Amino acid sequence: MEYQYPLDLDWTNDEMMKVIHFFNKIENYYEASVKGDEVLNAYKNFKHIVPGKADEKQIFKEFENKSGYNSYKVVQEIKKNPNQTLFSKDFD
């Protein structure tokens, strides 16, 4: 699937890489599987770059519109299942 990640050109290269890394973890959830702690660590880094809830919602919506992947759903599922290690859309 070809699409661009929702990035802010005011971010540093390091910040852009952290946001892309987070979205890569979301892609892994939908396309294969991913460890919950990896997603939460990537999300924590994402939140340092995008601390505002409104900005987060906008970026998540842009990503979902382009990719079809719901970042919010993935993060919430992982937070609700702290004892589970591996996550995938096929596991729900």
Swiss-Prot record:
Q: Which Pfam families match?
A: UPF0223 (PF05256)
Do you know which SUPFAM superfamilies this protein is assigned to? BH2638-like (SSF158504)
User: What range does the record give for the signal peptide?
Assistant: none
Q: Which family does it belong to?
A: Belongs to the UPF0223 family.
Q: What is this protein called?
A: UPF0223 protein SERP0684
- What broad taxonomic lineage does this protein's source fall under? Bacteria, Bacillati, Bacillota, Bacilli, Bacillales
